[in-house]
UniProtKB/Swiss-Prot annotation:
Biological process, per Gene Ontology: translation
Protein source organism: Eucalyptus globulus subsp. globulus (Tasmanian blue gum)
InterPro entries assigned: Ribosomal_bL32 (IPR002677), Ribosomal_bL32_plant/cyanobact (IPR044958)
Primary site of residence: plastid
Lineage: Eukaryota, Viridiplantae, Streptophyta, Embryophyta, Tracheophyta
Name of the protein in question: Large ribosomal subunit protein bL32c
Keywords: Chloroplast, Plastid, Ribonucleoprotein, Ribosomal protein
Keyword flag Repressor: no
One annotated GO molecular function: structural constituent of ribosome
Family indicated by similarity: Belongs to the bacterial ribosomal protein bL32 family.
Annotated Gene Ontology cellular component terms: chloroplast; large ribosomal subunit
Subcellular location: Plastid, Chloroplast
Length: 52
């Protein structure tokens, strides 16, 4: 006989959502930092040609 599943609690949903948000925030911060270093020319990990 089929039994309905228990619904996920609101606190558990919130915790999972916050974990996902933290991952996204860190990735965005890293991308922004890389973009800043490329624009100023201080990047040591990327070789990019500058157009003058």
């Amino acid at each position: 006989m089929a039994v309905p599943k228990k619904s996920t609690s609101i606190s558990k949903k919130r915790i999972r959502k916050n974990i996902w948000k933290k991952k996204v925030y860190r990735a965005a911060l890293k991308a922004f930092s890389l973009a800043k270093s490329l624009s100023t020319g201080n990047s040591k990990s990327f070789f990019c040609t500058t157009i003058k």
